[in-house]
């Protein structure tokens, strides 16, 4: 059974299944699927998982661990991997089994991070398959926290203003 902090925003058409824990002020946006059916998923605080993203696990091998203040762009696939605090995954990107994106690391839009790869702190990776493009500037790394803050604030607006039964059958 999922464990969801009461301050998290879960869009009415998001699906959360199985052994999932979601931290405070986190936003799980419209059309997301968070599927901890065969292993655990842990999502930290003030993280935003944007519209149409799929988060899954690998049976008997890898859970999925997403830290605090993480931004995951629209339509990403996050599969059996670790995203450390204040990491960033661009729209449409795929992170595969056993991968790690370290704190302050970034995977660009539409990139494919192959199984077992690690993006070190402060690096931007992009492409198919993803490779290091360059080091991030301090300003870019600081923006990850700004992005997380903006989405956490938006999640709180939804939590306080959207009826709890929105989108549910009567």
Feature names for model-found ranges:
Residues 1-28:
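N-terminal segments that cap or nucleate solenoid repeat domains
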Residues 1-3, 37-58, 62-66, 74-170:
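Glycine-rich hexapeptide-repeat left-handed beta-helix
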Residues 71:
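Short proline/glycine- and basic residue-enriched helix-capping loop/turn segments at helix->loop/beta transitions
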């Amino acid at each position: 059974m999922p464990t969801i902090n009461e301050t998290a925003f879960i869009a009415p058409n998001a699906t959360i299944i199985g052994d999932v824990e979601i931290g405070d002020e986190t936003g799980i946006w419209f059309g997301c699927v968070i599927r901890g059916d065969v292993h655990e998923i842990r999502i930290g605080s003030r993280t935003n998982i944007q519209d149409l993203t799929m988060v899954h696990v690998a049976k008997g091998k890898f859970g999925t661990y997403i830290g605090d203040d993480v931004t995951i762009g629209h339509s990403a696939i996050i599969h059996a991997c670790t995203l450390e605090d204040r990491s960033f995954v661009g729209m449409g990107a795929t992170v595969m089994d056993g991968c790690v994106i370290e704190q302050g690391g970034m995977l660009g839009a539409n990139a494919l991070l192959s199984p077992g790869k690690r993006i070190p702190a402060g690096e931007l990776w992009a492409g198919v398959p993803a490779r290091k493009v360059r080091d991030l500037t301090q300003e870019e790394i600081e923006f990850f926290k700004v992005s997380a803050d903006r989405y956490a604030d938006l999640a709180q607006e939804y939590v306080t203003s959207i009826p709890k039964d929105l989108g549910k059958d009567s």
